[in-house]
């Protein structure tokens, strides 16, 4: 007997791959017109379960019911045709085509033998109006922001008359304002009777938007609870199988003498304005700020990815030329970029290649071939020292969890023995258990006297991991505070300091450091 309030029932789903049981007897029940969150550490089986629903994988055992009818989708098109859509974390759009082309690709409305562009435009406009999406259907996708691209993908799901929409990490690249807009759209869909399966690592969002939460661990169902009955601590305990009494490791590194000085750094576009600070050996310096504060741009200018306009970068008392990334690398700098999948890894290549790519020239022999024995040895060092969970050095890095991918990205730089590590959103898209491991790793690197500069949009992370926090506002330094003494309120106040300023350059000497 199927519960009529459940739009979707996935019963006793199991899925095996060679040597791995990815799903073990998992049951998921989703009510009509509800937001049902799916949580678990990376590798818990969330994506595999959704791929079984969406027809990408076929379960070895178990049954799927939609509106009481048993279904078994042959592929994703079959799922779409039957009202199941999926908005992937990695947006799959043809960037050089316009918005409405992307919405109706492969199923254009026809007028005789020709595409009915007017109908396509009108249908797109109607969906956008219903969802309060402010995008011109004729705009090229390449001109849209990440948030707008996400909204277009949701509109596409709605255009299939979907009853169930799976959203995989939909807010990973969105601002707070954009998240608020997304939640308004989700609430509209909920009122229309559409069920949302919402996958996210962001517990605050889960508790705000969800009706029910299902938690998975190691391919198994652990619990399904009303969101109103859950706390962050309970979610963490259910996800990792133990209590995390502290979200952050103890800061047991001791900053020493100054190793890096940045004086009046501006970029060639003058988006950075006279940025000045000091970094000590064995110190973790956070960079906080609102969207548009130019935090990433600061790291890119330090690393030579962005052209410097003026100012000095001084390492060990001597000016260094970081005008190009290869020069920055030679000077002992390393950059872990924000968008790991786009700029940090080669997803379709194995771990060993990704581990040595930042230092690949050093592995060439006199004959021009690669020294495979040394590559294997160094790759194993990365796997062991970073505590990477993988069956083999030859495993494709794209198949690993986000946390394990990030460990390899950091490890590849450590093979170069850098002195200054620039980390841009190092825990983005990583589950709570893996985050703790990354924090421990950063702490260990500080104990080895590395100077670390870390950009993060998560205020608790900056306060819990860093020694000091440099706050930026509109491309300027608005303050430098002691992480153990400051508050989120003070950081937010400093983040807004120069938002109304349109001209003039801030004098770095007027900035007070709280140390």
From Swiss-Prot:
Matches recorded under CDD domains: ABC_Carb_Monos_I, ABC_Carb_Monos_II
Pfam families given in the database record: ABC_tran
Keywords: ATP-binding, Cell membrane, Membrane, Nucleotide-binding, Repeat, Sugar transport, Translocase, Transport
Principal EC category: translocase
Free-text function comment from the UniProt entry: Part of the ABC transporter complex MglABC involved in galactose/methyl galactoside import. Responsible for energy coupling to the transport system.
InterPro entries: AAA+_ATPase, ABC_carbohydrate_import_ATPase, ABC_transporter-like_ATP-bd, ABC_transporter-like_CS, P-loop_NTPase
Binding site for ATP: 40-47
Family label: Belongs to the ABC transporter superfamily. Galactose/methyl galactoside importer (TC 3.A.1.2.3) family.
Keyword tRNA processing in record: no
Oligomer status and interactors: The complex is composed of one ATP-binding protein (MglA), two transmembrane proteins (MglC) and a solute-binding protein (MglB).
Any one Gene Ontology molecular-function term assigned to this protein's record: ATP hydrolysis activity
Database matches in PROSITE patterns: ABC_TRANSPORTER_1 (PS00211), ABC_TRANSPORTER_2 (PS50893), MGLA (PS51260)
PANTHER family: CARBOHYDRATE TRANSPORT ATP-BINDING PROTEIN MG119-RELATED, GALACTOSE_METHYL GALACTOSIDE IMPORT ATP-BINDING PROTEIN MGLA
Gene source species: Clostridium perfringens (strain 13 / Type A)
Catalytic activity: D-galactose(out) + ATP + H2O = D-galactose(in) + ADP + phosphate + H(+); methyl beta-D-galactoside(out) + ATP + H2O = methyl beta-D-galactoside(in) + ADP + phosphate + H(+)
Keyword flag S-adenosyl-L-methionine: no
Domain ABC transporter: 8-243, 254-499
One Gene Ontology CC term in the entry: plasma membrane
GN (gene name): mglA
Protein topology in the membrane: Peripheral membrane protein
Organism lineage string: Bacteria, Bacillati, Bacillota, Clostridia, Eubacteriales
Enzyme Commission number(s): 7.5.2.11
Name of the featured protein: Galactose/methyl galactoside import ATP-binding protein MglA
Subcellular location: Cell membrane
């Amino acid at each position: 007997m199927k519960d009529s309030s459940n739009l979707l029932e996935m019963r006793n789903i199991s899925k095996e791959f060679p040597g791995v049981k990815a799903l073990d007897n998992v049951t998921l029940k989703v009510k009509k017109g509800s937001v049902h969150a799916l949580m678990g550490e990376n590798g818990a089986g969330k994506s595999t379960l959704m791929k079984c629903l969406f027809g990408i994988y076929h379960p070895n055992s178990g049954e799927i019911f939609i509106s009481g009818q048993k279904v078994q989708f042959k592929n994703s098109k079959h799922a779409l045709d039957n009202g199941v859509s999926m908005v992937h974390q990695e947006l799959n759009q043809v960037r050089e085509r316009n918005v409405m082309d992307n919405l109706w690709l492969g199923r254009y409305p026809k007028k005789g033998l020709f595409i009915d562009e007017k109908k396509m435009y009108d249908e797109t406009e109607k969906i956008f109006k219903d969802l309060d999406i402010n995008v011109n259907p004729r705009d090229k996708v390449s001109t849209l922001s990440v948030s707008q691209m996400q909204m277009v993908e949701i509109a596409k799901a709605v255009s299939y008359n979907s009853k169930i929409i799976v959203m995989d990490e939909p807010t990973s690249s969105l601002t707070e304002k954009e998240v608020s807009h997304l939640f308004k759209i989700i609430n509209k869909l909920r009122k229309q009777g559409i069920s949302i399966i919402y996958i996210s690592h962001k517990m605050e969002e889960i508790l705000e938007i969800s009706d029910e939460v299902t938690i998975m661990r190691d391919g198994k169902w652990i619990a399904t609870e009303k969101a109103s009955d859950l706390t962050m601590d309970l979610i963490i305990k259910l996800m990792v199988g133990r209590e995390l009494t502290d979200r952050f490791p103890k800061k047991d590194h001791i900053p020493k003498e100054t190793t890096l000085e940045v004086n009046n750094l501006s970029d060639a576009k003058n988006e950075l304005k006279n940025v000045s600070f000091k970094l000590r050996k064995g110190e973790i310096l956070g960079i906080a700020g609102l969207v548009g504060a130019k935090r990433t741009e600061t790291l890119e200018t330090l690393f030579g990815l962005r052209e410097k306009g003026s100012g000095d970068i001084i390492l060990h008392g001597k000016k260094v030329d970081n005008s190009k990334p290869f020069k920055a690398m030679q000077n002992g700098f390393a950059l872990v970029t924000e968008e790991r999948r786009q700029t940090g890894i080669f997803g379709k290549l194995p771990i060993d290649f990704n581990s040595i790519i930042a230092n690949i020239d050093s592995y060439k022999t006199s004959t021009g071939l690669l020294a495979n024995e040394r590559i294997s040895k160094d790759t194993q060092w990365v796997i062991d020292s970073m505590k990477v969970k993988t069956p083999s050095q030859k495993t494709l890095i794209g198949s690993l969890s986000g946390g394990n991918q990030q460990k390899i990205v950091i490890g590849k730089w450590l093979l170069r023995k850098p002195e200054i590590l620039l980390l841009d959103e190092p825990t983005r898209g990583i589950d709570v258990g893996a985050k703790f491991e990354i924090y421990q790793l950063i702490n260990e690197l500080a104990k080895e006297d590395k100077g670390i500069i870390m950009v993060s949009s998560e205020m608790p992370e900056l306060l819990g991991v860093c020694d000091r926090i440099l706050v930026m506002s509109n491309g300027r330094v608005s303050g430098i505070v002691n992480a153990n003494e400051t508050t989120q309120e003070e950081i937010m106040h400093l983040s807004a300091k120069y938002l109304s300023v349109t001209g003039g350059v801030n004098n770095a000497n007027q900035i007070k450091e709280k140390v």
